[in-house]
Amino acid sequence: MDPTVVPLRPLPSPHPDAGPSPLGPVRAPFSATLAANEMMDARRQRGEPVLPMAFGEAGLPAHPLLREALASAADWTSYGPVAGRAPLREAAASYWARRGLPTDADAIVAGPGSKALLFGLMAAIGGGVAVCRPSWISYAAQASLAGQAAHLVPGSSGVPDAGDLARTVAAARASGRPVRSVIVTLPDNPTGTQASPSAVRALCSVADRHDLIIISDEIYADLRHDDDAEFASPVSFSPERTVVTTGLSKNLALGGWRLGVARLPDGWLGPELRARLLGVASEIWSAPAGPVQHAAALAFSEPAPLTERITLSRRLHGRVARSVARRLSAAGASVPAPQAAFYVYPDFTPLAGALRRRHGITSDEDLAALLVRQYGICVLPASAFGEESRRLRLRVATSLLYGDTDAQRLAALNSADPCALPWIAASLDQLDEALEDLR
């Protein structure tokens, strides 16, 4: 079997004597990030200590303007258009226009989260999909759900290496396996870093040469720590073949409201892909929730109070992520500097010998299990994102350290020095103590 293709795992019978299962193969395991979130909740309910650093939830309360907008539309009980209501699509189009990308409202499709739109796009495009290694957990799983192969291509900061991508696509097609799309994450989850414009341009060149549709997941684009740093989207280089997705779960911390939007490609491909995506949407989610669409239209119109909220969120995420990165680095891990969102991606390989001798750790799963079992620190092994488990990498999320109440979270949001707040400082001290003992 091609090692770059994610296989489907068989479902075992529930009992040894039960005979063959009537179910088919498992196309996707339970999401590791959502499983980690439920595990953390279960530990809390049992009264066990938890330092929640596994789940990438933005960890801040909804802005009052958005709560009011949601409540005011509670009577919107009809289904509405599959693509989303016109005010939302017009607001989303204006969001991209303010970023230098003129967009027609007809090029926008809304869905119940960008996650659903990503799956819908894979199903609409068909064929195999090239995915960066490492990358967000759900890309490969969604490809499997759509009955497609996910071809894992080495890369960094959410963008597959251009040369490796070209070779992977050529080899797959030569063996009769079509590859029709490539997914990039800008900025990246799990690494919390941002790809260079040259890397994005090189990927676009390969996509043009091999006729690949680019799906650019830009859910973290508004949470770049340095807003002045150059940011390159594939749509700037290949607008006729790039779909851009985003949503409100990260920049405005509305993960539970489930609202995302896709900007379809310019040129002839956009209307064709729109028709196919709406076909998928009509059979799966019908339409996004009406009240949420009303609040989202306000969000994408970007009134000053909401842009200020995003600015403060970006500052908070950056300061806490950098503080955690410094602690991990001081403990001996190799840590890329966080550039966006609320993720840190330490590599404990420099400590592999000591970890093996002291704790019997030989994989990233071992390390993550030890941290939660012995110290109550919940993180994810990088192998959940496609890495080899022998590399002792972890994905550390920092956004649930901001407090247990809305009052604490708002204090963190407005603080010039959030890491000095007692509840955040206590979490950082707990991390320091575990790292010291780990060595």
Residue map of PLM features:
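PLP-dependent enzyme catalytic core of the Aspartate aminotransferase-like
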Residues: 2-4, 102, 356-358, 370-379, ...
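Hydrophobic residues in well-ordered beta-strands that form the structural core
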Residues: 131, 152, 214-216, 296, ...
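N-terminal small-domain helix-loop-helix segment of the aminotransferase-like
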Residues: 11-112, 120, 302-303, 402-405, ...
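Helix C-cap/helix->beta junction micro-motif
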Residues: 46, 146, 209-210, 331, ...
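Conserved glycine-rich beta-strand-loop-beta hairpin in the small C-terminal domain of fold type I
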Residues: 314-325, 335-354
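Conserved core segment of the aminotransferase class I/II
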Residues: 8, 241-315, 327-328
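Conserved PLP-anchoring active-site segment centered on the Schiff-base-forming lysine
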Residues: 124-143, 149
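Active-site phosphate-binding strand-loop segment of PLP-dependent enzymes
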Residues: 157-230
